[in-house]
Each structure stands twice: as C-alpha cells, then as structure tokens.
Amino acid sequence: MQRRGAGLGWPRQQQQQPPPLAVGPRAAAMVPSGGVPQGLGGRSACALLLLCYLNVVPSLGRQTSLTTSVIPKAEQSVAYKDFIYFTVFEGNVRNVSEVSVEYLCSQPCVVNLEAVVSSEFRSSIPVYKKRWKNEKHLHTSRTQIVHVKFPSIMVYRDDYFIRHSISVSAVIVRAWITHKYSGRDWNVKWEENLLHAVAKNYTLLQTIPPFERPFKDHQVCLEWNMGYIWNLRANRIPQCPLENDVVALLGFPYASSGENTGIVKKFPRFRNRELEATRRQRMDYPVFTVSLWLYLLHYCKANLCGILYFVDSNEMYGTPSVFLTEEGYLHIQMHLVKGEDLAVKTKFIIPLKEWFRLDISFNGGQIVVTTSIGQDLKSYHNQTISFREDFHYNDTAGYFIIGGSRYVAGIEGFFGPLKYYRLRSLHPAQIFNPLLEKQLAEQIKLYYERCAEVQEIVSVYASAAKHGGERQEACHLHNSYLDLQRRYGRPSMCRAFPWEKELKDKHPSLFQALLEMDLLTVPRNQNESVSEIGGKIFEKAVKRLSSIDGLHQISSIVPFLTDSSCCGYHKASYYLAVFYETGLNVPRDQLQGMLYSLVGGQGSERLSSMNLGYKHYQGIDNYPLDWELSYAYYSNIATKTPLDQHTLQGDQAYVETIRLKDDEILKVQTKEDGDVFMWLKHEATRGNAAAQQRLAQMLFWGQQGVAKNPEAAIEWYAKGALETEDPALIYDYAIVLFKGQGVKKNRRLALELMKKAASKGLHQAVNGLGWYYHKFKKNYAKAAKYWLKAEEMGNPDASYNLGVLHLDGIFPGVPGRNQTLAGEYFHKAAQGGHMEGTLWCSLYYITGNLETFPRDPEKAVVWAKHVAEKNGYLGHVIRKGLNAYLEGSWHEALLYYVLAAETGIEVSQTNLAHICEERPDLARRYLGVNCVWRYYNFSVFQIDAPSFAYLKMGDLYYYGHQNQSQDLELSVQMYAQAALDGDSQGFFNLALLIEEGTIIPHHILDFLEIDSTLHSNNISILQELYERCWSHSNEESFSPCSLAWLYLHLRLLWGAILHSALIYFLGTFLLSILIAWTVQYFQSVSASDPPPRPSQASPDTATSTASPAVTPAADASDQDQPTVTNNPEPRG
C-alpha cells in the first residue's frame, strides 16, 4: 500500500444543498464574532454528508497522514517531478496545530495550504488559508513549518464567552502546488487555482467531541456573581432523550359510531436534529408506514367514511388520507407537490365483523396495502400501487383524525391499536403492532356473533307478528266486540315459533319476552322492529328495577337487558356496563363492563359515551389516560346537546345542580300537583308576569321536578306576551313562533313581537332581530348591526353570531374568512355560557391550528365535558333519582344516581356518596365498591369540585375508611384545597392538625399564601389559620373559629403571664409579705395568752355554773375565753 506520494486526489466537493433548517439567522448566530468564516455552525453531522465522507475520505487520509517517501529523494530530484506532502505533528484538532509541509517545484510555483471542515448542515467550509511563492529553489525538496490556527469554537468547550461550541464531523487539511508560468493572477480564487494543481495532497485530522475538549483560558476575571452562575452549569452535559419515529396513536379500542366525531392527533417536530433533518428532506418523497386494527360492522352509508386522514393548516386533506367506500373498498388520497390531489381505490374489499390489520406503506410514489385477518395475521389481500407524481408530505403542518370529523363521518365499528412509522417504509413482517386487549377484542367479536342470532330471531318474530296482525285486521275490521277485547282484554300473543328446542334453551329470556309481548304493538316496519322490540324488553326490565326491591332483582333482569342490547337498544348496554363496573348486585366484572360501555358508545348511547369519555379523561377503572380519546366521546355528545334541548320529544329534563344535603333547595322541588307549582299557577292566572315566565320555563324545559310539557308552556308564553307586556315573555313567545315549536309558525307576528321586546331594551330581542335578518332576509349588514349592538349589551349569542360571520367570510366590509377573529368571538361567547361557542373553542384547543388557541387536549376535554353534561337525557336520569329520593324510594334513588354518577357528573357523584352515608346498609348490600370513598374521591378530581367534598376526603384520609389506611399528608392536602376554596372548616381542620402535632409542609403553606418566613413557628401559623377561619365564617354570632381564636389568645396570654420575670418578682414579694405577716400574727397571739395554771378540784363543780354569786374579775376573764370559742351561736 502506498503511504505517501504526489498527486493523490481527494473526494469531489459535495454539491448537495444543506437542509433548510441551517440556512438563515440560526446558522449565522452560531458563528463567533471573529476568526471564523460565515456559515460554520451546528452541533452534529449531517447524516448523508458524513456517510459520503466516511466512505471515501478517511481511507485516503490515513494513507497520507505521517507518511514517508517510497521513492528515494535522489530519484525524485533527478526526475524533477513536482510533489507535496505534509506531516501533522498532532493528529487532533488543536487551537494551533503544527504542520510540516515538504514539497518540490520544477518551475516557479505557488504552494497553497487550506483547512476545511464539515459540520451538521455545512460541508467544506474553509477555516484556514495560507499560500506562499517558490521561485528560486527549484528542483529541490524544501520543508516549511506552518502553524494552522483553528477557531476556538472548534477546539474548546462552552464557557461564559464561547457560548456555542460546534460539533465538527470532519477536518481536512489539504495542500497543492500550481505553476506560475500560465500568467495567472496571485489573487485568483482558491477554487479556480485548485483546478490547475500539478500536485496535491490532504490528510484528515481527528476531531474531539465538544464535551471532551478543555476549557479555554481567556485570562479574564469574571465578576463573582457571573462566575458563580457559570460554575453551577459548567460541567453539565445535556443529554438528548431517546427518540424514534414510531408513534402509537391508539392503544385501547375506540368505539366509532359512524358520526362526525373522531380522535384528533398532532405530531410534533422531532427533537433529534438528525431525525428532523431527515423528515424535512422527505417532504416531497414520503417514506412512512401506517398499521391499524379494525373491526367493521357495516360499510359506509355515505360516499366516504373516515378511517385515518391528515388535515393541513389550511383545513384541506393532505397526505395520507384513507377512507372507506359504500362498497367496502379503501379510498387512498394524496396531496401532490404541484398542489393537486390524487386518489386511488383498492381492488379488494375489506372484511366485516372480523378483526383485521391494515398496513399501508408509502415509499415515494409506491404504495403497498396489506390486510391480515385475526391475531395470527392470516393473509387476506395485498396490493401494490405505483405513481409517477411527487407527493407532498409534511406530517407536522396540521393534524391527523381517526374516524369522523366535521368534514366526513367515521366508520361504524371499532379501532384497535394504531401505529405510525414516520420515517420508514416497512414490510408487514417488520411491523410490530399486536392486537392489544385481546380478551376485550375477543369479547367484542363474541358479542356481535350472539347478537346476530338474537336479531334474526326477533326479525322473524316481527315478520310473523306483522302477518298475523294483518290477518286479524282483515277478518275483524268492523267487529265492535273484538275492538273492546283488544282495548280491555288480554293482549294477543304468539304461542308457537319455528325454532328448535336447542335455540330456545340458548336464549330463554328472549323467547319469554317475545311470548309476553303484545302482537298488535309490534311495528310494521321490519327495519325498525328489532330496535323497538329491544326497547320494549328494556322498558319491562326497568319497570321491575323501579319496584320497592328492584335492586334485589338485578341478577334476574340482566339476561333481558342483554337481549335488549343485542337488539340495538343501547340504554340497556349502559345499564349492563354500570352493573358490571360497580358490582350492583352482580359479581363485579371489569371486562364485561368495558365491553358494554364500548358497545353502547358505538351505538351512540349518550350516557355510555360520557362514561367512556370520563374514564379516559381520568384514567380510572383500568381505562388508559387518553385526552384525545376522551375528547372524541365527549364531543360526540356535546354536539348533540344543543339539538337535544330544542327537541320536544324524548325523555329529557333540565340538568340542575341540586344537592341532597341542601334542605332549602329540596323544599322548593315540586310536581304538577305540588304546592310550589300550584302557587305559581295561581299567581300566573292572576297576571303576575314573573310567575308566568317561571311557570312557562319549568314546563318548557322540565325544571324543578315538573315534567316537560311544551304545549302548556307555550300557552303561558302567549298569555304573558299578549297580556302583561313583559319583554322577556314577548321575546320567548316570538322565538316559539319563529321556530314553530309546538305551535304553527307565524313569522309576521313573531317579528312584531321581537321588535317590541327589543324596543323595551331586551338584549336577547336585539340579537333575535339580527338572527331574523341573517336567516330569513340574508341581509348580513343589518344582522351584523344588530349583533354588534347586542354584544355591547352583553349578549353571548351575539358574540357567537359575529364569530360565525367572520368564519363564513361574510362579515360586511371584511374580505375573506378570518378564523382568528372568529375564534376570539367564540371564546367570548363561551365565557358567557354559549354552548356552540364552547364547542368551537374545544375544537380549536384539540387541533391547535390557530395561534390564539395553542393545542391543549386537556382543556379541550374540559370544555366539551362541560357542554355534554348539560344533555337533557342525563338530566332525565338525575331527575328520576331525585324524585325517588324525595319519595323515600331508596332502591330506585340508588340505581339512578349510580347511573348518573358513572357518567362523571360531579353533582351526582357527591349525591350518591351522600346516599351511601345515609344508608350504609343499602350500599354494602348491593354495591361491589366502596361507595363513599369511590364517589367522594371521584368528585375531588373534578374541575368544579365543591369544598365539602374536599373536607369529606380529608376526613376519610384522617380516620381511614374501611380498607383504606390513614394518610395525614393527603388529609392535609384535602383540607388545604377546601380552605383555598374559601371554606372556613378547611382552615379550622388544618389548625386542629397543628394542635395535634402534625407538621404542615412548606408547599402547602405557599399554596395557602402563608409566608413561612413571617410565620416561622406553629403558634403564628395557628393565629393566621384561625383568623382566616373567622373571616371566612358566614355565621353572624360566635362561631367555632372565633371561639378557637379567642381560646388561643387566652392561652398565649396565660403563657405570657406565667413566663414573665416581673410576675415572678411580684409573686415572690407578695408571698414573702404574706409569710412575714403570718409569722408576726402568730407571734402576737402567742404573746397575749398567760401561762397555764394547775386546775383545782371543787366538790360542787357541777353546780358552779348555776350559782347566783358573782365571780371576781380575774376569774371572769379566765372563764370567758373558753366560753366564747366553744359557743357556736352569735352573741346577743
């Protein structure tokens, strides 16, 4: 192998343009102010450029570094052949590298030496240049030492002055000789000079990673604060997180109902620069793979149904977009570089009611579509499609949608695991995407197989009932006796079925329900008959549940609910899901609970969808935490809620926040025959406008325990509008006339009434006028005028309507659509409680396509959940539970509050926990969960959790509850949250914990805005807590907080007294005086008493007291003292 020689070449300079990320200010910013050519920057090598250099350059570099001549010098001088080679004394890049250049010129020449480097996004950047002439020493080998100086950012680590040292991939030192006889100018360009080289050579220097380099001695003294800050981070080595191109878009089954809602996912840019550079380079040559599991129930009922598609920042379909057609084919659409769209349809149809995996690989213009059936991935179909067009692909400039959206409906079925390989085109054998939740997936398949049998049985029964009913009507058309029999007699039933005993034994509850069903009530439309029969089975089951001992019958009712669910009546599916998830008088079974929740969600059952949305929002009951998946379920119900509210039919009621612990609110609940309702009716009849309005609202929306009765409500609206001249009643009646809700439309009268109400200053009526001109007259200028006026008056509907004008691009004087301004109006409307405005805001938060609404999936879920929980069907369940509670029907109250609480609405969760506290025997007997703990715990994780729920959980953590152990730390957190919400009991409980010796952590004090530096001991903290407790107490008289505060200060005062030096001195002084006085007193008493005399016996002692003789004075004084001391009576 030749190790040294003249004329060796090097790889041709790369002409590939650098990735666009390095072009511009960012690349220039990494160049130091002096000594470095412009354009050198970055930290890691460009992958493609580095591969080219390492394959070619290093091998030649190793051959020429530190080389010796193979040809003797004498022979070289005789040959007079130009050559050049050099020796680098240090193989690493240093600040000053010494290079020995040996060369020979046969003619006058110029010797050129250059150092070029390659960084992350740049190649062949010169950092050192030197040239010199040789005109005299010809035909002689000469040596010159050159000190090559490299920029500091290539040699040293980051420090206070070198802020961005660069990572260099290759450093090449090259030299060449050119002759001067051609007459070229000395100042000719280096690149042009290089082309005329007669001898050239190069070597490759070894680079040092940035964090292995030494620090540079700048010989500058930093200020102490700057030096201290720098020393804190001087030795920190940043680490890039492990990142790859695989994205798991979905890991848990998603029940797609075939409606205009779906899962929204957004890809971020890669944090790894090399991956990001690769992604950018492939924008016009997409290389990626999609792998997803599907279980289809039906093919698309429209032209196209969404499976997985990309929506760009302009709200247009991008690459890729995969849809399902009516016939069962796949429709795959791509966006071209030239701006057009291109689509292709597969040659095969995908299977129904089978779990299968769909793999789609893109590799430039080639698409490979593969379907595999079952968990063993049995091959089903494979198709390769090739195109000559260039596809445009930018997976970060928009968002992906799984299922439906406002642009297209989704499929009817279930999505399984979905993986996306962003930078790789893989063969199906290379894809790792197993069917997760295998048991659940198998249960879904078994459910629909069983339900196919049930639906066939019901369909045949409905057909037989239809023909039997027709024969009876034809034979007995005018028989009055039979009419009476049909009306008052026992219903006619079908006694014989064309099924075998084996099938009857397999579905006993179904055949029992069909045998007991009235033939004449079966619908004639066979397509609707299965669902309606399921509804009748459900109604009979619910009637049994509503009895006195309804919960006791659940186990026998479950089979009937199962049959009802199979018939497509998915209220039964939700009941079953709740029964299994809570263990409501059935063995608790999480798998079955998930199954029926998903089945109900797929059937678009409102409570089931809310249940799924809540479980994924909180990540509870073995459901994974997934806000995008939660949003898909909540948004489905939220979009239906405004429509449901304007639907007069259906079991709906207004969702009211009524707490069972609030006796005052419970007292005003009424019914049509209740005292409150009768009093309102009496006042309304007398012409009281407020009573008429309230009565109409209660009847129209079904509020305060009154059943929904739109017809009666409209009568009161009309009476109030025409008699009392109340603007609110006039407006309400005008809206009813405009929409024809329960009354014949009368646009003319409605407009007159609307103008009349607006003239009275009602902002709703001003907004109504704008709505009239927008909807009926298409006069957008007048509509905007009224809406702007109503918005100034504080009407949220007007804000929403103005947003619609900007969104549609029809706002007068403003050309084109303005989504940013529309979003601002929608946000203002949402803050005023407008449902549609809230929905638009949640959509903006989940997509992140507007700068004013940065992507925030959690906030999107919260806003969609807020609207969904106003749904009237949920309100109906809550109202039934409340009515049962007021009537003392504990079984029914527990049932309906469990059903409502599992949807995630806070008021029902706290009410259910309250019922379980009132009737713990009922909860223990029928529920398979710790009712009090579960639902108070759920409630404290709500956005608008009440303070008493925090107090309850604090007590449960403090005392421990059933199987839950005591946890003082969590108890402190719960009390602190209650205190932060302004509840005085929270402050009081925290103070009691401190009295017991519990230490409140500093972060809790900071949370309560108690400065730990000002309150450094427990006494000062207690004072602050009791003072806040007193200030937040709403009791006018003495409260426990005020008494506790007073007691604390008395203790402090007494403690201060006992520990005072003055008190000790005074006490000692007084005690000394008392002792001295006592001693002096006893001394004086003892001095006044005479010495005792010996007693003399007298024979007549017994009679001496009765003697009339007067005793001498001395004797009298001697006898007087013992008489006084022994006499218990006062002297006379």
UniProtKB/Swiss-Prot annotation:
Topology term for the membrane: Single-pass membrane protein
Residues where Phosphoserine is found: S608
Name listed for the protein in its UniProt record: Protein sel-1 homolog 3
SUPFAM superfamilies: Concanavalin A-like lectins/glucanases, HCP-like
Stored InterPro entries: ConA-like_dom_sf, Sel-1L3, Sel1-like, TPR-like_helical_dom_sf
Glycosylation sites: N201, N382, N527, N937
Origin species: Homo sapiens
Amino acid composition bias (Low complexity), ranges on this chain: 1097-1116
GO cellular component: membrane
Pfam families noted in UniProt: Sel1
Polar residues bias locations: 1119-1132
